């Protein structure tokens, strides 16, 4: 109901979320479990086979045990892997890192009022104190922990005053979570990308760095500032004034992740709590403005983006004869009447939701691929993390992993853990 809830849903398509231990309902039969895998085939292109896998943007070690063997099979027989963006291209990575900031000579002073700026400064100081307190609590005598906390603050939050409006908004939401609780393991999406590289599969990005950098095009700067103000209000009300409610604010995210792991994620969960900011919009004019912003954000992040992704997936599937294509994008893009699946069906594709009991049939002999598949997906110690972790050099500190920069866009690798 607050703008915070809306940003939660968006952030699940671009960034990270806190993960909880699996506590699935054992009564849910395996055949009913949603494994977030669909087969896609066009009658006129029988020599090509596509698989769509709905990912979640959390460390792969947190969800790996729950990933169905059918997903592993589909990846094993694939020749081509479609990802939201190519994170192995240096130019792309540099563009993603740079795009969140304003021009060199600009700061947030150019678009924030003095009053709002001071409120954000108070929040940032609270976060810095929290980081240092956490580090000291871990081991009071370990100066490296405290230094590590300082580095993380400087790297992730330190240059907040240079952020573009939309990225300041995303940053404020991210700060509602405990950065230190996040695993250093690669995200599931990045893990798949690294496995595809190791297997010498063809990798094709579905979106460009420019599209990832600018996920919201219909919302004006003034509207984003309006959203920032309400997010700041949420932070002040739920966290600064009531620290004990901090964990409550994260429950919806944890619930989404838990349902993903258990295969019980349903479409109506994405509309839980309304995804609205009108709780803090008291006047009639404010309520109308909040509603208009909500509509624009949903249109940009879900409807327009799903259509764009579906068209590109369609083009790739039709253009790769005798190939098996494995697409890994945020699971949220497969829900709703304007989903990627809906658009593909409207384009003549036969889309089938797969179950654990289904059998993946390769187009060609699977022997070579199966051998590699077993090494890739079972020998976790072989993961080369450095090649799939985006890092940024802080001006006065060591290099700190900037996993949260991975878009999704993701937006929303799509805001979200669920949407990329």
Curated annotation (Swiss-Prot):
Protein name: Metalloprotease TIKI homolog
Cofactor(s) the protein requires to work: Mn(2+); Co(2+)
Cofactor: record remark: Divalent metal cations. Mn(2+) or Co(2+).
Pfam families: TraB_PrgY_gumN (PF01963)
Any GO CC annotation of this UniProt entry: membrane
Keywords: Glycoprotein, Hydrolase, Membrane, Metal-binding, Metalloprotease, Protease, Signal, Transmembrane, Transmembrane helix
Membrane side Cytoplasmic: residue ranges: 420
Coiled-coil zones: none
Subcellular location, principal: membrane
Membrane topology: Single-pass type I membrane protein
Spans within the Extracellular topological domain: 23-400
Recorded family membership: Belongs to the TIKI family.
Signal peptide (UniProt feature, chain positions): 1-22
Organism (species): Caenorhabditis elegans
Class of the enzyme per the UniProt entry, highest EC level: hydrolase
Membrane spanning stretches: 401-419
One MF term in the entry's GO annotations: metal ion binding
Source organism phylogeny: Eukaryota, Metazoa, Ecdysozoa, Nematoda, Chromadorea
Subcellular location: Membrane
GO biological process terms held by the UniProt record: negative regulation of Wnt signaling pathway; proteolysis
